[in-house]
Curated annotation (Swiss-Prot):
Gene Ontology cellular component terms for the protein in this record: DNA-directed RNA polymerase complex
EC top class named in words: transferase
Function comment: DNA-dependent RNA polymerase catalyzes the transcription of DNA into RNA using the four ribonucleoside triphosphates as substrates.
Cofactor note: Binds 1 Mg(2+) ion per subunit.
SUPFAM superfamilies in the record: beta and beta-prime subunits of DNA dependent RNA-polymerase
Protein name stated in the entry: DNA-directed RNA polymerase subunit beta'
GO biological process per UniProt: DNA-templated transcription
Residues in the signal sequence: none
Positions contributing to Zn(2+) 2 binding: 815, 889, 896, 899
Binding-site residues for Zn(2+) 1, renumbered to this chain: 66, 68, 81, 84
Cofactor: Mg(2+); Zn(2+)
Higher taxonomy: Bacteria, Pseudomonadati, Bacteroidota, Bacteroidia, Bacteroidales
Name of the gene this protein is made from: rpoC
Catalytic activity from the UniProt record: RNA(n) + a ribonucleoside 5'-triphosphate = RNA(n+1) + diphosphate
Length: 1433
């Protein structure tokens, strides 16, 4: 065997390249050829020579022992045995040594002709079908036509045609087949992968590239153009990887054999073997290859050979990718064998199973129990577990102290658990924290560090306050313990991961270690006041006196008393009298002085705020102590108060019967209206549901009122709810109000369930009847099923989010951008959803912010907006602030600190190296799982709110209308609004400042006019909440056109009343569309209305109508039950940038609406701008139009119903609008569930979705049209080409060619040279830069298109990503987190930042000594000019 250099791979590489393997490379990495299909000898269990497990090729099976046993022991290391040829070395080389198989005929690699896009096919310009025919030996392909007539390259021939051709040529040109292959006259046609190999060798990439580029630019047919561009991409990737890739390497002549220990063969008892599938696949290849060798040697007929060659091709195919073939090779029990590709793919593949998720040593797991007496940073660790985890440290100490001499005896002592080890263990554990982790780890607070305390027993003790972060409870949860070993790891655990440092939630900056349950209840109980009890109204000179009085039993803990206390006012400590209670004094003993005196009832919310302010004012250490103190107080007081409840505490209000009676009466009235035919079936349904929702709401209010006054508010059930310890209004309503309306079971999970109109009137205290119970079960079970299914969805969403954003790291302090986002407060109707304060807090301002009234500068440009400044801005008249945002950050890699703003987990500006991408992904993904787990708590109750149907003024002011068209109703005192885009503003009568903005729905009744003054509480407008309507704007006679029974409408008679109604249906005759017209006495048409599908026509043909009368009602969809079950898919839809199922058609310009004629079931609508530009849209008749003729619309206004697609927003309103749209829409889904997540997390993800642009016109750059590239790459390429010239006519120049791109300088030199020689000079034009349009990618696509191929491959579609990367010869620069984890490097973030790698940590004295030596070295005089003194590190 040839001498081989040790090729250990160093682990300090900084990039990885993937290319096609050439046959030479495979041979270079191989240790020998595998010739036989045998694996091991079944009697001796020794590997067969030259077989798949051969020791000569792959190395010895036992450490330092050759096959025949001549050389044993380590002293013969490196010797090759002269008898059996095995090198004496360690057995682990069998994990890294490769072999190879020499194939008799070349074989095409399945990845390159069976995956889409078809690489070999695109290079040769052959369709997949033809390619398969060649590769699987069905057709000959002409490689060089030579003298043959009527044939060209790449023509396919059947066998007969081929043989005929050969005979013909032999007749006309004798000896043609004996010419050299290089002779252009020779006719060459081949079959199988050999033919493909020859063709690929002959491919001239450059000429194909020029030809295709030309075709893409000039071809008129769109299809041929796309085809050319697709082929061009494959050709260009090969050109880009010139020098490392040759096209013919897609056909293999040598196959590598992976090391035997990676495809083990294990003998089981009973003489059977368990083996890896790969061995079977390799065996088939070797058997077929050997058989083919023999057949060729004995000169078998062509037919037999061809069959054998085809079988070899198939064997190799199934070795590389068995799942891609239609006829996969199956094992004995009909299971497809696992090929090489399958072992990379999926959750069980190499990437996800072994590289990204490894099992680690020094870990333990056990059940958790609560440890109420622990401090915030401590956890209880069972003794036995600790002894095992800290074993090496204990052994070292045992030897150091001289208790034992050898490691072996020390091990025995530890294993026997001798008493001497316990105090050593105590000593070793000091300052050596452990990491606790609870699965599923949904966010970074799922792993925290604690200082362990030894405890008896076998369960881990966990601090009760850190349960929220872990989402742990003590009903049998288990947790894992990990031990950090190196000093750096211990330091990081102590300084960054200690539980007492992780008090804030990175998702929203609110404290996450908030007391819950018992603690809250205890604190709430003692801080609640109770009038008229012992000691009410007493006055004390200080807290001490009050405490003494309490201890003496002179004053009750709840009694309102007056006390002098110290309080902070404007930063000063002052003594003042407050009305408070002994309980509140107790709490304030623990509240840090700087926070001031807390004088309120402490519920969960109040506690969260207090903890937040303690952190801001006093820092983390104080907060940790404060938390422990109130935890102890809370537990103690909950115990002292004896706060449990019995059945009598669950009160049922006396008004219940009366309210239910009211409900019945109202429903009866509705049914009567319905049977008289005043209202439609849907209206009846909606009104009934509404009635019961109202009744239920009123009952709840009565109930809560009664509970809160029961026993002076000290009703246990009420206290539990009010403090936020347990239970919600909903649950109490079900306990003692009524269960309310339930959702109907429905078949598909698509649309929200309808609601059963008979409510459940009983509550749980009274007990449900059998029917009620039966109805209830559906909700409960649906909840449980949803939970199980949705957890997986949420987990998958998190995974995609992490994958798309894991390389977003803070890379620099300031990217220097001048752009930002204009931020205002978010309103829905009238309610502020997110205040300006919340949205700008902790962000960086783009400009100086100046107070409009005083003219002071509040915040300078580039400064963080802190709490105080944000509050000033909130209180001032400033409406909008421009803030720096991740969305506008211009860093090439990652984002910059100024654009990100404050790190929510620390409340300070974010530092370089913070992994904001992963934090964003976790913050968004974690509540997804939480929320889906919460669906069943409300038991499927239909929680829809009673619909509003009128607008009351909230202010005194003057009304202003914009774009209002209204008609006076004939016989009433109001107007009816007939315009669609009407805005109503209420302005302050004195200053004219707008107080409120409202949109007025079409068809609403209007009770005031422009400029009227309104008082607070006046009803301005009123509308029908259940129906959209069409109102007559003129008086006249009604006439219908195109309203034909069973073509455009059907009569529906109501089951109960027998009244008939016309309902417009989708027109069966596409030329006909239903219209309603109003005509005057002379038969002139005054107004024309088109009737949408599903409309109920209220009037009949020939009826006289008055102004403002309703002609048509279009029922709005029925009340749906809400669950985040609707929410999660919505979030996914937004992040994947999917188009909704029925998208709205949107106007692209501002303009006036005109109606055109009908075309094939579509109505044509034109929008004409003021400048006369016209756009036409075709809208299906089945869709409801949202605009009327002559309406004025703005760009981006939907013309038909449906959701607007993000792509439309991007195209019409630009990137900023679509970014804001996605962020706000996703936020809405989470807000609906009451989950707070900071905007910046969504911005990080949306930034990643908008990284890429699509090339519209490549100009003279290297890009292709329709190619998708990174924004920054386009900018760089355009900068590179800027100012350069393109040669049009090379003149007499020897150097330049036409089409070449040159710098102006080179051109000047060349032309001046030509001028001197009086030759023709070079003509040029300016180089054209590329133009590109921004595109929006879904997170899955964005993740698959990251720069790093390793990150993409480990995410999804592994084989596709890898084979495309290999063709391009891609280099992975290991910039993200995943790639580095896969390579086993430290991640380039946090403490692993590449800048810190070169840091040398030394003692100060050593450092000064070293610099002094360096200085003296540098100051030695030399002949050369003195060196500049290097700045000291």
């Amino acid at each position: 065997m040839a001498f081989r250099k040790e090729n250990k791979i160093k682990n300090n590489f900084s990039k990885i390249r993937i290319t096609l393997a050439s046959p030479e490379e495979i041979l270079e990495n191989s240790f020998g050829e595998v010739l036989k299909p045998e694996t091991i000898n079944y009697r001796t269990y020794k590997p067969e020579r030259d077989g798949l497990f051969c020791e000569r090729i792959f190395g010895p099976v036992k450490d330092f022992e050759c096959h025949c046993g001549k050389y044993k022991r380590i002293r013969y290391r490196g010797i090759v045995c002269d008898r059996c040829g095995v090198e004496v070395t360690e057995k682990k080389v069998r994990r890294e040594r490769m072999g190879h198989i020499h194939l008799v005929v070349p074989v095409a690699h399945i990845w390159y002709f069976r995956s889409l896009p078809n690489k070999i096919g695109y290079l040769l310009g052959l369709p997949t079908k033809k390619l398969d025919a060649i590769i699987y030996y069905e057709r000959y392909v002409v490689i060089q036509p030579g003298v043959a007539e009527g044939l060209s390259q790449l023509d396919l021939l059947s066998e007969e045609e081929y043989l005929d051709k050969l005979d013909e040529i032999e007749r006309t040109h004798k000896g043609n087949q004996n010419l050299e292959d290089t002779n252009p006259d020779k006719f060459i046609a081949k079959i199988g992968a050999e033919a493909i190999y020859d063709l690929l060798c002959r491919v001239d990439l450059d000429s194909i590239s020029y030809e295709l580029r030309d075709r893409a630019n000039t071809d008129g047919s769109q299809q041929r153009k796309t085809e050319a561009l697709k082929r061009l991409q494959v050709v260009e990737s090969f050109r880009a990887s010139k020098g490392v890739n040759r096209p013919e390497w897609m056909v293999m002549k040598v196959i590598p054999v992976i090391p035997p220990d990676l495809r083990p063969l294990v003998p089981l008892d009973g003489g059977r073997f368990a083996t890896s599938d790969l061995n079977d696949l390799y065996r088939r290849v070797i058997i077929r290859n050997n058989r083919l060798k023999r057949l060729i040697e004995i000169k078998a007929p062509e037919v037999i050979l061809r069959n054998e060659k085809r079988m070899l091709q198939e064997a190799v195919d199934s070795l590389f990718d068995n799942s891609r073939k239609s006829s996969a090779v199956k094992s004995d029990n009909n299971r497809p064998l696992k090929s090489l590709s399958d072992s990379l793919k999926g959750k069980q593949g190499r990437f996800r199973q072994n590289l990204l998720g490894k099992r680690v040593d020094y870990s333990a797991r056990s059940v958790i129990v609560v440890g109420p007496e622990l401090k915030m940073h401590e956890c209880g660790l069972p003794k036995d577990m600790a002894a095992e985890l800290y074993k090496p440290f204990i052994i070292r100490k045992l030897i150091e102290r001289g208790i034992v001499k050898t490691v072996k005896s020390a091990k025995k002592i530890v294993d026997r658990k001798e008493p001497v080890i316990w105090d050593i263990l105590e000593y070793v554990m000091k300052g050596h924290p452990v990491l606790l982790n609870r699965a599923p780890t949904l966010h970074r607070l799922g792993i925290q560090a604690f200082q362990p305390k030894l405890i008896e027993g076998k369960a881990i003790q966990l601090h009760p306050l850190s349960c929220t972060a872990f989402n742990a409870d003590f009903d049998g949860d288990q947790m894992a313990v990990h031990l950090p070993l190196s000093n750096e790891a211990i330091l990081e655990a102590q300084l960054l991961m200690l539980a007492s440092h992780n008090i804030l939630n990175p998702a929203n900056g609110a404290p996450i270690t908030v007391p819950s349950q018992d603690m809250v209840l205890g604190l709430y109980y003692i801080t609640k006041l109770r009038p008229n009890i012992k000691g009410h109204g007493l006055i004390f000179y200080g807290p001490e006196e009050a405490t003494i009085a309490y201890n003496e039993g002179k004053v009750d803990i709840h009694a309102p008393i007056k006390v002098y206390v110290e309080d902070y006012e404007n930063g000063e400590l002052v003594r003042r009298m407050v009305e408070t209670s002994v309980g509140r004094l107790m709490v304030n003993e623990y509240v840090p002085k700087k926070v001031g005196y807390v004088n309120e009832v402490l519920g969960k919310k109040a506690l969260r705020d207090i903890i937040g302010s303690v952190i801001k004012i006093c820092g983390v250490a104080t907060t940790a102590k404060f938390l422990d103190d109130i935890k102890n107080l809370g537990y103690y007081m909950a115990f002292k108060g004896g706060l449990s409840f019995n059945l009598a505490d669950v009160l049922i209000p006396d008004e219940k019967d009366q309210l239910i009676q009211e409900g019945y009466t109202a429903v009866e009235q509705i049914m009567q209206d319905y049977s008289m035919g005043f209202i439609t079936f849907n209206e009846r349904y909606n009104q009934i549901i509404d009635t019961w929702t109202h009744i239920n709401g009123r009952l709840s209010n009565v109930l809560i009122k009664q509970l809160s006054s029961d026993n002076d508010g000290f009703n246990s059930v009420f206290m539990m709810m009010d403090s936020g310890a347990r239970g919600s209004k909903e649950q109490i309503r079900q306990l003692s109000g009524m269960r309310g309306l339930m959702a109907k079971p429905q078949k598909s999970g698509a649309e929200g369930g309808q609601i059963i109109e008979n409510p459940i009137l009983s509550n749980f205290k009274e007990g449900l009847s059998v029917l009620e119970y039966f109805i209830s079960t559906h909700g409960a079970r649906k909840g449980l099923a949803d939970t199980a299914l949705k957890t997986a969805d949420a987990g998958y969403l998190t995974r995609r989010l992490v994958d798309v954003s894991h390389d977003v790291i803070i890379t620099e302090e300031d990217c220097g951008t001048l752009r930002g986002l204009l931020t205002t407060e978010l309103k829905q109707n009238e309610d502020v959803v997110a205040s300006l304060y919340e949205r700008i807090l902790g962000r960086v301002s783009v400009h100086d912010i100046i107070h409009p009234t005083t003219g002071d500068i509040i915040v300078r440009a580039g400064e963080e907006i802190r709490e105080q400044a944000a509050q000033i801005i909130e209180d001032s008249p400033i409406e909008a602030v421009e803030i720096r945002s991740v969305l506008t950050c211009e860093s090439k890699k990652g984002v910059c600190a100024k654009c990100y703003g404050r790190n929510l987990a620390t409340n300070r500006m974010v530092q370089r190296g913070e992994v904001v991408g992963v934090i964003a992904a976790q913050s968004i993904g974690e509540p997804g799982t939480q929320l889906t787990l919460r669906t069943f708590h409300v038991g499927g109750i239909a929680s829809n709110v009673a619909t509003e149907n009128s607008l009351l003024s909230k202010y005194d002011g003057i009304l202003e209308f914009e774009e209002l068209r209204a008609v006076d109703a004939t016989d009433e005192s109001h107007q009816v609004v007939v315009s669609r885009m009407t805005e109503l503003r209420i302005a302050d009568p004195n200053t004219g400042i707008i107080l409120a903005n409202h949109n007025i729905p079409y068809g609403a009744k209007l009770f005031f006019r422009q400029g009227d003054a309104v008082k607070k509480g006046d009803k301005i407008i009123e509308w029908d909440p259940f129906n959209a309507v069409i109102v007559s704007e003129v008086a006249g006679t009604l006439s219908f056109e195109g309203v034909v029974e069973n073509v455009t409408f059907k009569m529906e008679s109501d089951e109960t009343t027998g009244l008939k109604e016309k309902i417009i249906i989708e027109s069966k005759d596409k030329t006909m569309a239903p219209y309603a017209r109003i005509i005057d006495e002379n038969g002139e048409m005054l107004k024309n209305y088109s009737l949408p599908m599903g409309a109920h026509v209220v009037k009949d043909d020939g009826d006289t109508v008055k102004v403002g009368e309703i002609l048509v009602k279009i029922p709005r969809s029925v009340g749906k039950a809400g669950d985040i079950t609707g929410g999660l898919p919505r979030v996914t839809e937004l992040f994947e940038a999917r188009n909704p199922s029925n998208p709205a058609i949107v106007s692209e310009i501002d303009g006036e609406i005109g109606f055109g004629k009908l075309k094939r079931g579509n109505r044509e609508i034109t929008v004409t701008s003021k400048l006369g530009e016209e756009k036409k849209y075709l809208i299906p008749l089945s869709k409801q139009l949202l605009v009327q003729e002559n309406d004025f619309v703005r760009a981006g206004t939907p013309l038909s119903d449906g959701a607007i697609t993000p792509a439309d927003i991007l195209a019409i309103k630009g990137p900023t609008a679509v970014q804001e749209y996605i962020v706000n829409e996703v936020q809405d889904v989470y807000r609906l569930q009451g989950v707070k997540i900071n905007d910046k997390h969504f911005e990080v993800i949306v930034r990643q979705m908008m990284r890429k642009v699509e090339i519209v016109d490549p100009g003279d750059t290297l890009f292709l049209e329709q190619q998708v590239v990174d924004k920054f790459e386009v900018m760089e390429e355009n900068d590179r080409i800027w100012g350069k010239k393109v040669v049009i006519d090379a003149g007499d120049s020897q150097v330049l060619k036409a089409g070449q791109i040159v710098t102006a300088r080179k051109l000047r030199d060349e032309n001046s040279m030509l001028k001197r020689k009086d030759l023709k000079i070079v003509k040029v034009r300016d180089a054209k830069s590329a133009t590109a349009s921004q595109i929006l990618q879904g997170i899955t696509r964005a993740a698959l298109q990251t720069k790093s191929f390793m990150s993409a491959a480990s995410f999804q579609e592994t084989t596709k990503v890898l084979n495309e990367a290999a063709i391009c010869g891609k280099t992975d620069y290991l910039e993200g987190l995943k790639e580095n984890v896969i390579c086993g490097h430290l991640i380039p973030a946090g403490t692993g930042l590449r800048d810190y790698e070169k840091l040398v940590v030394m003692h100060r004295d050593d450092y000064e000594k070293a610099t002094a030596e360096r200085k003296s070295f540098l100051s030695v005089p030399t002949a050369e000019p003195a060196m500049e003194e290097a700045p000291s590190e």
